A protein has these predicted regions:
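Vicinal oxygen chelate
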Residues: 14-17, 38, 73-100
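Short secondary-structure boundary/capping segments
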Residues: 1, 49-50, 80-83
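Core-facing hydrophobic residues within beta-strands of well-ordered domains
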Residues: 3-6, 88
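Core segments of cupin and vicinal oxygen chelate
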Residues: 12-65
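Long, contiguous binding/interaction regions
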Residues: 68-71
Length: 100
């Protein structure tokens, strides 16, 4: 099987508006897909995909439209829920910056 990198990473967010503002406005990743899913255990889930380049995406799921389905204090960090220090589990985007 030919390795082709990842298709997408999927994370949770409790504020889709702020997530979109950061990934679209700050990082410049265009939104390429938005789904609204009806999931019995989670209710209505908004699922948004951003293009990171090279055919790879990062996606976020939010159940803001289903109050009470996800805890209001949902911890969306990668490390804390595993009992690890900050930054232990993470992902990084490659980039090119012009050097002066």
């Amino acid at each position: 099987m030919k390795r082709m990198g990842f298709n997408h990473i999927d994370l949770a967010t409790t504020d889709m508006g702020a997530t979109r503002a950061f990934y679209e406005g700050v990082l410049g990743f265009p939104c390429v897909r938005t789904d609204v899913l009806e999931i019995e255990a989670a209710g209505t889930v908004e699922h948004v995909f951003f293009d990171c380049g090279d055919g790879q995406m990062i996606a976020f799921a939010s159940a803001e439209g289903s109050p009470g389905r996800w805890p209001a204090n949902l911890d969306t960090s990668l490390s804390k829920g595993l009992g690890l220090g900050r930054g232990v589990y993470h992902f990084a985007f490659g980039h090119e910056f012009a050097r002066s």
